[in-house]
Amino acid sequence: MIEQADEESVFRNRNLVEPDTIIDRDRIVGRDDQLRTVVSNLRKVLNENRPPNLLLYGPAGTGKSLIFDAVARQIRDISKNRGYEFGTLRINCQNLRSLDEAVYALVREAAHDLNEEIGVARHGVSTSTKYDRLYDLLDEGYDSVVFVLDEIDLLLGRRSSSSEPAYSDLIYQLSRASIESIDIQVSVAALTNDPEFMNNLDARAESSFNPRDIPFSDYDANQLQEILRNREDAFIQDALSEDVIPLTSAFAAQSHGDARKAIDLLRKAGDVANENGDLTVTENHVREAQEDVETDRSLKLVEGLTTQKKISLYATAAVAEFGKSGSTTASSRVAFPVYQFLTDVLDADGRTRETFNNYVREVGTYGQLDHERKSLGGKQGGGMYLMYEFKRDPGEIKKRLEQDERIADLSHHEDGLNRVIQAQKRNFAED
């Protein structure tokens, strides 16, 4: 049955409609100027010269990573054939909370690329020691390297009112590495959605970085159609009905010309067809996939919550998940002690019951849950409490929250969490 289902898939090569797949240059659409500029700058490596620092900026899904990665891969292959070791070390700064985490992430990437031990502890070691290990790896394994700092504007770090964002320090240190710390050639490519990014760098980082600017604009509907046409061979022959690509590109054009969303939607439409046992992807599959995307979008808002709000929501979702089978409700009288347990586990500051409830109610404005004020009447001395009801599977919300590295640690405490929840339920005789 499994083999039969695989044979009947609408996909020939599903990877081609994965948004982060590195594709060949001949599949790149509507980015001739940007492609020429990236090629012109990176090809300096082929003459064993250092490429300049680069700043690629523009809205999400406009081809920044796609173009840089496609060119860098080709340059690396050519260099390797010539006996010259060129590498790119990429980190996404979205979930990195500090300069120290960013430097460790670069060490980890270098060690993985070179098949070496990381060689430095993640915690309990100074950032300076991590830099030293990074530079040792670079000296041992490369002749030239480009640090690719994706979503660099999100690396703010733990700032006081007078301190600079962490990305200023990181860019300053990396852009000076080949001058002060190591013998190989080092460049920095910063990728950001923020066109004002350079205005936020401190003066020394701006002077040291001094990048070549490469702006990216939104794709229009015609370009999005061409992008999807160039990936049509991800599907078996005649698997796409005529209206699928125009409709998919139209939905994506409404989302500010984001090619990543267009590709993602086309893949999801194919998945819907597979799930339904259909051998042709139709307009209806696209519309169903778009509805799923819009539902998922509200969950993505959860990812942007502060840590305290995430812990509050996680505690409430856990109470609902560990309740009766199919339960989607959680009492604040149970959820708040669970929140206190979780803050202890994470060694995080605890907030008052009122603040906790304010956090959870705020999440309700994102379409995740509703709340209702209830009275205990004569039970347990009376009083009021809130009953939260989730609009979707609380387990799904927990999994989304666990994408945060810190919250992910809570998944290792499921048994203890369940015991606390059941004990609190017994205390308040609530289900």
From Swiss-Prot:
It comes from the Archaea. InterPro entries: AAA+_ATPase, AAA_16, Cdc6_C, Cdc6_lid, ORC1/CDC6, Orc1/Cdc6_arc, P-loop_NTPase, WH-like_DNA-bd_sf. ATP binds at residues 62-66, 219, 231. SMART domains: AAA. GO terms for biological process: DNA replication. It holds the Pfam family Cdc6_C. Keywords: ATP-binding, DNA replication, Nucleotide-binding, Plasmid. Gene3D superfamilies: 1.10.8.60, P-loop containing nucleotide triphosphate hydrolases, Winged helix-like DNA-binding domain superfamily/Winged helix DNA-binding domain. GO terms for molecular function: ATP binding; ATP hydrolysis activity. Involved in regulation of DNA replication. Belongs to the CDC6/cdc18 family. This is ORC1-type DNA replication protein 14. The lineage of its organism: Archaea, Methanobacteriati, Methanobacteriota, Stenosarchaea group, Halobacteria.
